[in-house]
Amino acid sequence: AGINDWGGVSPLTPDHVNPEAPWPHLDKLSKDTEKAGKTLAERLTIYPDYIREGDWVDSKFITPILELVDAEYLPKMDSWTPGEIVEPPLSVLQQIRDRASPLNQNIKDIFEKVDEGQLLNEHEVVSLFEARGSNFSAVCDKANELRKTVNGEEVSFVINRNINYTNVCYFKCQFCAFSKGKLSENLRGKPYDLEHDEIGRRVAEAWQRGATEVCMQGGIHPQYTGQTYIDIVKTVKDEVPEMHVHAFSPLEIWQGAETLGITLEEFLQDLKKAGLDTLPGTAAEVLDDEVRAVICPDKINTSQWLSVMRAAHQVGFSTTATIMYGHVEQPVNWARHLIRVRDLQIE
């Protein structure tokens, strides 16, 4: 009939509405709810939709409330948050390791679709992200099973050095270590812009210590042009011709081409001739303009990010893709991000 909330259920207070027939123990209620294809999840006294909209909540309470909830605006069951250097709680890690079968028919149907090699739609990907309890364990187990099929059990690594050539940036996103200004100087240090000789020295030092790759990115310096990025690549190859250069996000590629007045393909060809080997898929944040309008409104949009990567593939580059989660986004935004990356791979 559409019910999605058990009214009056509380582990803290008795059932004052119907004291003669109190609510069953939460464990039993949880199991009965799960058998019906639903998941029992605690909520705050504020419904998730009201937290999501934000305008309903007084501004001084928004941050404290958001610190209490997960991406679905339901209460977190532990104090762990994304971005911390500690591992998630053991209870979560155990759920990931458990080999459970999904109880939710919708999850079962999605698994069947995956086994048949069909592409999942946005709603189905969101359903996987929103899985809880044994359904969550089943999704993790299924993902691990697919990983084994696609990649096997061998794990490789590369000895790499990150070289950030500048932390000066004219974009205004506040989450980035390259964002400089009065509000960030005490947290991120003084502005710097490495000379090419210093970049070369760091490349040589990395090679001497066993590195075979350098990853180079930085802020979008107002004085940088596309030629700056070309010269940085040449600096690396002049110092150590064998060094693999993994550098420049789609944002830097977009800005570089724009400053030189050439197409993305032409600029990427110039970088390739200079010695660029692969491109990192950073500056993606979340590939959904609904989120980007909040966290990075002045950066390239989703379509522009994808167009850079599409051009890179056409030129012959291999690329990666990143996602930055744990801020204002929701599972639907993760789903859109992954689907857009998947569709670009298929192209």
Feature names for model-found ranges:
Residues P11-T13, L44-P48, R161-I163, I220-P222, ...:
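Active-site-proximal loop/turn and secondary-structure-junction residues that shape catalytic pockets
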Residues L26-S30, G200-V203, I230-K234, E265-L268, ...:
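Generic structural signal for well-ordered alpha-helices
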Residues T13-P19, R161, K180-L183, L187, ...:
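Glycine-rich, proline-tolerant flexible connector loops at the mouths of alpha/beta enzymes
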Residues A138-L183, P191-Q217:
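N-terminal pre-triad scaffold of radical SAM enzymes
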Residues C173, T212-E213, G226, I230-I323:
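Radical SAM/AdoMet-radical enzyme domain recognition
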